């Protein structure tokens, strides 16, 4: 019987469940995502403000250039009224003509007149810009931060919208100005009031289908399960009076670890746009990760409209600019996300690769790998890595992918035991280079073991009468050079017969061979399972000549048996 779980003793009485949304006819659970939403990167503002050391201007510029190169068309570049650094950065982008014609910069401002004037001033001379106005509307902040009722907070938003319009008309002649409003802490705001304040702001800006307003509904703090956020988004989408004049935008944070799910369900619920940061940077636990969202679409055969084909290059730039590492397990971009250590996983991946190679299909179907690592610029070298948890599949995959040695199944099992002993003794991971060292030390496929009881020095094969082969082999046997001869059904049988006459009983149980590459100078690999006395084991030989490779495999097996006796 399983022991019942025990109460934690943690102070759960301090907290209460988040209320559900009354939406019995919700439609989002039956929706599917068929195209990418509009993306807006907020790395340069929301992400930057959350850094221990905010970006220098040069780092901000490098990240801006990356975002443009990746294909982002809406980029929040700063809070110009918050710092001279942000103001100067916006001015540099405009004055140095660094904003591509198809990119719209976004700037953030609170609903205070002096901040709005400063923000609008930063945009003078720009071709197009999106001014993002926000004020907090949640019940908690109305009560403990502002001490205002609904009407008082609505007045802040409406007056802010008016100041935005007035200063834009005064200072931004010739600029294509678009508007965005965020009821900050939307998820902590009553839905009817969130709708009320958004409608009041729209009354000021008078959006049309040709000139829509962006209504951004942030989970400033993630407070519920993602399905509740989706219900909130669907409710808002249904009840907005000018829905055709609205770009409904999401801004999920990751406090509960569900930002990606919240964004995806929010899009299913009717949202048109998503704001986030590369690799989930941002306040506290971060904003939603734009890389994960984009790659999730890609993995479903949907164009993310963002270029992530060099995900390591993107990661390096983000790590440099943010001065924060990306976790090795971060979806799609972490160092270890395409890596398998588990033996059963490695075996399945190996067989998946082999099946795709055999059938020539283009549809990606490899167990444990949701996408082809090569599609994001990764190689297959790190897909399978060997440690104490690995089995024959991983070992065999690396031997084939790195060294072109296609080990027979029973040899895979035998060699994985050799590797397992090494990892048990030494611990840690075994690299491909170390794996080759273990293999050559154990099997000596090309000879060269000074302590070997049997060493191949040279050989000559001739076809005798009755289709039998005769071999003359120069060997060093127990330290003495000698020539042995034998005949049999092929060179291997003849060599085994010669050894038996010298008191080395060898019986061949299985034999495999293949070329290592192509062309006239290609080498051959031979694998021999033999019984030497009562010991059954494998030998491996490698040589440009297939006969010599086979004889080396016999020698390899005999020497291994001698070491084990």
Swiss-Prot record:
Belongs to the alpha-IPM synthase/homocitrate synthase family. LeuA type 2 subfamily. This is 2-isopropylmalate synthase. It comes from the Bacteria. It comes from Parafrankia sp. (strain EAN1pec). Its EC number is 2.3.3.13. The gene is leuA. It is an enzyme of class 2 (transferase). PROSITE patterns: AIPM_HOMOCIT_SYNTH_1, AIPM_HOMOCIT_SYNTH_2, PYR_CT. Homodimer. Mg(2+) binds at residues 46, 251, 253, 287. Pathway: Amino-acid biosynthesis; L-leucine biosynthesis; L-leucine from 3-methyl-2-oxobutanoate: step 1/4. GO terms for cellular component: cytoplasm. Residues 37-312 form the Pyruvate carboxyltransferase domain. It is found in: Cytoplasm. It holds the Pfam family HMGL-like. GO terms for biological process: L-leucine biosynthetic process. Residues 446-565 are annotated as: Regulatory domain.
């Amino acid at each position: 019987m399983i022991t019942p779980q025990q109460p934690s003793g943690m102070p759960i009485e301090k907290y209460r469940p988040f209320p559900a949304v009354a939406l019995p006819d919700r439609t989002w659970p039956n929706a599917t995502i068929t195209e990418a939403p509009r993306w807006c990167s907020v790395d340069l503002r929301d992400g930057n403000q959350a850094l221990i050391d905010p970006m220098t201007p040069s780092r901000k510029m490098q990240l801006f250039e990356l975002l443009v190169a990746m294909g982002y068309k809406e980029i929040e570049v700063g809070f110009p009224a918050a710092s001279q650094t942000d103001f100067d950065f916006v001015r540099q982008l405009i004055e140095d003509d660094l904003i591509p014609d198809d990119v719209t910069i976004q700037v953030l401002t609170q609903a205070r007149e002096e901040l709005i004037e400063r923000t609008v001033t930063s945009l003078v001379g720009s071709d197009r810009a999106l001014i993002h106005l926000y004020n907090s509307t949640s019940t908690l902040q109305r009560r403990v931060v502002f001490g205002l009722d609904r009407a008082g907070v609505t007045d802040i938003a409406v007056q802010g919208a008016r100041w935005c319009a007035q200063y834009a008309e005064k200072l931004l002649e010739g600029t294509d100005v678009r508007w965005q409003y965020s009821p900050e802490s939307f998820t902590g705001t009553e839905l009817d009031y969130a709708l009320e304040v958004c409608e009041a702001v729209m009354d000021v800006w008078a959006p049309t289908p040709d000139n829509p307003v962006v209504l951004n509904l942030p989970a400033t703090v993630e407070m519920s399960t993602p399905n509740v956020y989706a219900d909130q988004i669907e409710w808002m989408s249904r009840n907005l009076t000018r829905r055709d004049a609205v770009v409904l935008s999401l801004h999920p944070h990751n406090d509960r670890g569900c930002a990606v799910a919240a964004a995806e369900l929010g899009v299913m619920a009717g949202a048109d746009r998503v704001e986030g940061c590369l690799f989930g940077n941002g306040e506290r636990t971060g904003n939603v990760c734009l890389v994960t969202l984009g790659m999730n679409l890609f993995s479903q055969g949907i164009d993310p409209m963002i270029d992530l084909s060099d995900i390591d290059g993107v990661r390096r730039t983000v790590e440099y600019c943010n001065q924060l590492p990306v976790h090795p397990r971060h979806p799609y971009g972490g160092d270890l996300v395409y890596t398998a250590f588990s033996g059963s996983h490695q075996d399945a991946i190996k067989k998946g690769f082999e099946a795709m190679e055999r059938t020539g299909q283009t549809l990606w179907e490899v167990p444990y790998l949701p996408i082809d690592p090569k599609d994001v610029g990764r190689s297959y070298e790190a897909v399978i890595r060997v440690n104490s948890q690995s089995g024959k599949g991983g070992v065999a995959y690396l031997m084939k992918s790195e060294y072109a040695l296609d080990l027979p199944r029973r040899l895979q099992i035998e060699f994985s035991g050799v590797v397992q002993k090494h990892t048990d003794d030494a611990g840690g991971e075994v690299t491909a280079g170390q794996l080759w060292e273990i293999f050559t030390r154990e099997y000596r496929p090309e000879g060269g073991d000074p302590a070997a009881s049997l060493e191949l020095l040279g050989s000559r094969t001739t076809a005798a009468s009755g289709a039998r082969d005769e071999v003359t082999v120069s060997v060093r046997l127990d330290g003495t050079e000698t020539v042995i001869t034998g005949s049999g059904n092929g060179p291997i049988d003849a060599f085994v017969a010669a050894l038996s006459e010298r008191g080395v009983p060898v019986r061949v149980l299985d034999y495999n061979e293949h070329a290592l590459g192509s062309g006239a100078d290609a080498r051959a690999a031979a694998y021999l399972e033999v019984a030497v006395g009562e010991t059954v084991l494998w030998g491996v030989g490698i040589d440009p000549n297939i006969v010599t490779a086979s004889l080396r495999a016999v020698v390899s097996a005999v020497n291994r048996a001698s070491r084990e006796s």
